[in-house]
Amino acid sequence: QDGASQTLVYANADLTKANQADEVLVFAEHWRSLTGAYPARLVMDQKVTTQAVLGELDRRGITFVTLRMRSVSLLEHIAEIPAGAWRTVALDRDGAYRRPKVVDEETTLSSYPGTVRQLIVSGLGREAPTVIITNDRVSSAKQIIERYARRMGIEQRLAESIRSFHLDALASSVPLNVDLDVVLSVLAGAVCASLRRRLVGYNNATPDTLQRRFLSTAGRIVNEGDGVLVRLKRRTYSPVLRHADIPEVAVPWWGGRTLRFEFD
């Protein structure tokens, strides 16, 4: 999922636990085939990658940010950190956990070539410190912590897709049906993301809210010859649609005929 637009840009219905660690490399190649370059930065959960894969990302020049599993030896290392080594970082967010304490250091991993930057962060509302590892040695500790924290927003959007499109309950064990479900879910998510950006006051609306208030509106479809008119019936939230930026669109696969909306 794209961190800025929160649009789901990649999905794989055939992913299993056995091959999930390499999927980040598959995505990197997919992104390069579309854009001509590897993604500049990948923020990921530690469960979907390995140290060897992180090394390969570094070799390809891709910046990564992920968590490190808290092993017994790592917890012992954290316990031995002197009090004077911790420094306070002020995060740009509201709430009780906006001033965590951080230890910024270099460390080695058993299956990672060279060293990696490690941020040990205490005071984020968890019992044990959060340990972030990255090959980004340019950004400040504050920037890296905030960047990783935005992953929670992405997970929230995925939870919305699960709730709205039942993304975790695909239709069938038949691969064709599953792939179709995933493609339709990606398209539906993109359509909802585009719609909410056009509706005043609904920039953060969830797909199920859009469905209830706008998409389930009844109406009539009129074939005008050189275009199609969709006339929607009046509802409580019709004024929001009237003021929305929904332009008349020429549809290529309709031979250039237009699609436009009107409201009773």
Residue ranges of each PLM-predicted region?
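Electropositive, glycine- and tryptophan-enriched low-complexity nucleic-acid-binding patches
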Residues: Q1-T35
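An acidic- and aromatic-residue-enriched active-site/binding cleft used to recognize and process polar
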Residues: G3, A13-T16, D45-K47, V53, ...
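Short, conserved catalytic/metal-binding motifs centered on acidic residues
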Residues: Q6, V24, P39-T49, F64-V65, ...
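Flexible loop/turn segments at secondary-structure boundaries
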Residues: T7, K17-N19, V48-A52, V72-E76, ...
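Short, surface-exposed connector motifs at secondary-structure boundaries
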Residues: S33-R41, R59-R60
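An anionic, glycine-rich sequence signature occurring as long contiguous blocks
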Residues: G55, R60-R157, S161-H166, V249-D264
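Short, solvent-exposed helix-loop connector elements
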Residues: A141-Y148, S164-L180, L195-P207, D226-R234
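A short, flexible helix-boundary coil/loop motif
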Residues: V191-D264
